[in-house]
Amino acid sequence: MTDLAHIRNFSIVAHIDHGKSTLADRLIQETGTVQDRDMKEQLLDAMDIERERGITIKANTVRIDYTADDGQAYVLNLIDTPGHVDFAYEVSRSMRAVEGSLLVVDSTQGVEAQTLANVYQAIDADHEIVPILNKIDLPASECDRVAEQIEDVIGIDASGAIRVSAKTGVGIHETLEAIVKHLPAPKGTRDAPLKAMLVDSWYDSYLGVIVLVRIMDGVLKKGMRVKFMSNGTLHHVDRIGVFRPAMQMIDSLGPGEIGFLTASIKQVRDTRVGDTITNDRNGTEVALPGFKPAQPVVFCGLFPVDSAEFEDLRDAIEKLALNDASFSYEMETSAALGFGFRCGFLGLLHLEVIRDRLEREYDIELITTAPSVVYHVFMKDGEMRELHNPADMPDLSKVDHIEEPRIKATILVPDEYLGDVLKLCQDRRGIQQDLSYAGSRAMVVYDLPLNEVVFDFYDRLKSVTKGYASFDYQLTGYREDSLVKMSILVNDEPVDALSTMVHRDRAEARGRAMCEKLKDLIPRHMFKIPIQAAIGGKVIARETLSALRKDVTAKCYGGDATRKRKLLDKQKAGKKKMRQFGKVDIPQEAFISALKMDS
């Protein structure tokens, strides 16, 4: 076990694409932790999708041995955290497991919204922060301006910021020295009862669930019985080890160290991020603060395009859920789309990642229904119901009021696009809370309904700002608003997959747009089809799809007009009967296009 004074635990904080994973690669390479022949780009990002999108989804860790210029041998534990807002809780737990952070800022881009969000989490966790200006090899690099911006926007001293090019390896040695000199050593007592924080967990088909832990007090030994404090379950520890990035087994972990344990645990659901692990006898009484189970925020239906693939989809979803405790699912059926699942996600990126993995790793074509958020429906009898699916909305006459989730959105944008961004937020029922400037960029803070953001807000924001805006949000709570369920009826039959919750003031415009879109997408039938948008029993928009018509009077030339009349009346009666019993086939493309519709 290593002496506490010679351990440094740190994480790297950065916006997407500012070079966090590349810097981690260089630190590993410089210290010889991995042989050059085993080295590859984004070494810590194991999933294909992490590599391809250049994002980090799971918190990864590596133990680095480093001999400093003062001749002392140090153990550096790096936790590579996700940078995206959907995984903010994983970030906050990883932050609590370490004592310092490297703040990486791209010297060509400057401070971005997610840099801010994660830096504030590091400051909340009382971290010592070392600023690093990356990409100094690029001609567009402006180190002095960006250092000034770090001081203005974040308020930490950046005069001694380390200038690095993670690509070419410049400044890597200085970074390692700064970690040893400026970051504090961990605290902890060897003789106290075991207290360890669960930082992350994932499923391995050979070892069962692998649990990443940071030891706060006490010692974790092989063969111990440990207790998970959130659910009281007991487990027998059969392996302990560290990552260099490959697994290396050891016998024990002491205070301040970060490693992993396996204990024949079957499901990731039993190991919750942020939980406290202790001895089963004479364990600690007080759990580590800040634990909360992950709550899904965005819900949507996933249906296979080919209904014969339903069982394959069930297997695939169960396998993904093994590895992702924040992903929830339950079966649902839809008259239009058949059997599928109602799934809960942490946010839109999480939804996209899961959907991509299902399509890519399990080769299943999917239809995704419109994403919706969790509403609180207060009934007149005082009961509060959580509404995950608009199709389950109770009868309006029994509803007292509905509350929707609100978010605090922080948007950083060059000032020439500010007007467009303000208009976009206003259109989405936003309330402006703050507007400040850092150099030539504006920072806007808005209170927005999450319902307006999950649909396509991010895409619209990127398009009105030519891709220059960066955006970050956090949930702030629930607030009452005038919300209604809008149903779409095709040939007087409600189509459950197209029902959505909308604000009363915007229902008519949204309903009209939806009806027009469906009119273009549904093929014509032998009878006319009304397409309607309705709130309760009141129709607020309607389009009529005209019938295909056969010319029944073609065989009559000349002769009596009553003969033609008789044939036309007979056709009319047939069409009326057909409309009564005829079934309208809505093609899959119509669903997909209607759901992708610009809100």
Swiss-Prot record:
Membrane topology qualifier: Peripheral membrane protein
Keywords of this entry: Cell inner membrane, Cell membrane, GTP-binding, Hydrolase, Membrane, Nucleotide-binding, Protein biosynthesis
Annotated EC: 3.6.5.n1
Subcellular location: Cell inner membrane
Residues in tr-type G domain copies: 5-187
Organism superkingdom: Bacteria
Sequence positions that bind GTP: 17-22, 134-137
Catalysis: reaction(s): GTP + H2O = GDP + phosphate + H(+)
Matching InterPro entries: EF-4, EFG_III/V, EFG_V-like, EFTu-like_2, G_TR_CS, LepA_C_sf, LepA_CTD, LepA_IV
Recorded GO CC terms: plasma membrane
SMART domains tied to this protein: EFG_C
Role description: Required for accurate and efficient protein synthesis under certain stress conditions. May act as a fidelity factor of the translation reaction, by catalyzing a one-codon backward translocation of tRNAs on improperly translocated ribosomes. Back-translocation proceeds from a post-translocation (POST) complex to a pre-translocation (PRE) complex, thus giving elongation factor G a second chance to translocate the tRNAs correctly. Binds to ribosomes in a GTP-dependent manner.
Similarity-based family: Belongs to the TRAFAC class translation factor GTPase superfamily. Classic translation factor GTPase family. LepA subfamily.
Family annotation (NCBIfam families): lepA, small_GTP
Name of protein: Elongation factor 4
